[in-house]
Amino acid sequence: MGIQPTELSSQDIADEPTLVKQEIAGRSPMQIALTRLRNDKIAMICLFTVLLFVLIAIFAPLLTQMFGVELDGGDPSDDLDQFNFPLIGPPDHGFSWDAPLGISPNEADDNLAQWLYGARTSLSIATVSTLAATLIGVTIGLVAGFSHGWLDKVINFVIDVFLSLPFLLVALALAPIIVSRFGNSPEQLRFWQFTSLLIVLSLFGWMTLARLVRGEVLSLREREFIQAARVIGVPTRRILFKELLPNLMAPIIVSISLGLPAFVTAEAGFAYLGIGVVGVPSWGQTIDKAVPYFNTYPLFLYAPVAGVFLLVVALNLLGDAVRDAFDPKTRR
């Protein structure tokens, strides 16, 4: 019995399953990292918390109006008793919409208004300092990693010198000198107090990133695309900022996410030690004022400490998540 050939009708052919060719879309390392980050629930919670603090800092004037509180102090003769303790608001006199977080002893300032504007001061100083330190560190790291010979050695020596200096002692000595030298008038005093704090934080915040960028550049400069760019005569500046810098975005983003909480903590600590903008509310200055009243009026201290704690924890956890997203090998 032989094999009979079969004929397929057009209908049979139409019924055959067809293979649909689907294009395989490639994803960049940045897209892969963002996908990992979106799937991390803790990272999303921390990101929401950080964004909430940012919105509070931006809209602090509107929020004070919405709650009906004022930044300027109240009347101590009406709102404080004979011992300069509050007569309204929690924790001793119950909740009041006139002072949801109570008022401060001795000055009768509204604690909620001070907290809202303190978030603005702390976040603005930390953000500007982080950006300035990142700019300095990336630039110096690029130059040190791409150069050869004496320039690389000089830059490494400068980095070692800065790392060997005691940060706190130098900051306590340098900031008052800058303020006393340039803050001659009351109008200039506040500006130079703000500037001196930025200078101190930025001056000692770039070294770690510079070394990180230098190490990455030492590896990248031997790659084929960099060698090809040098052979065809591409200018050095274009190689640094158009070829190398885009390949360094991952470690730079990780460094920013981990450096920002450190600057928030440093700003609060320096304000507590007297280095800050006098007359402008900040969490550190509020903590400085509240420490003597810890036993008798603890709410005055709890509010700014809680703000610093929540923001720093959220930023640290978000920074860890960003690092794990860009480098899964570091995941715990």
List each language-model region with its residue ranges.
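Extracellular/periplasmic helix-loop junction at the C-terminal end of a transmembrane helix
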Residues: F59-N84, V170-L172, P176-P186, A271-L273, ...
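Residue-level recognition of transmembrane alpha-helices
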Residues: V50, Q114, N156, L172, ...
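Transmembrane alpha-helix boundary and packing residues in multipass membrane permease domains
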Residues: F53, L142, L172-P176, L201, ...
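Generic hydrophobic transmembrane alpha-helix motif, especially the helices
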Residues: D98-S104, A132-G137, G145-F146, L151-V217, ...
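Glycine-rich helix-loop "coupling/hinge" segments at transmembrane-helix boundaries
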Residues: A175-I178, T265-G307
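Gly/Trp-centered helix-boundary motif
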Residues: M1-T134, V138, L142-V143, W150, ...
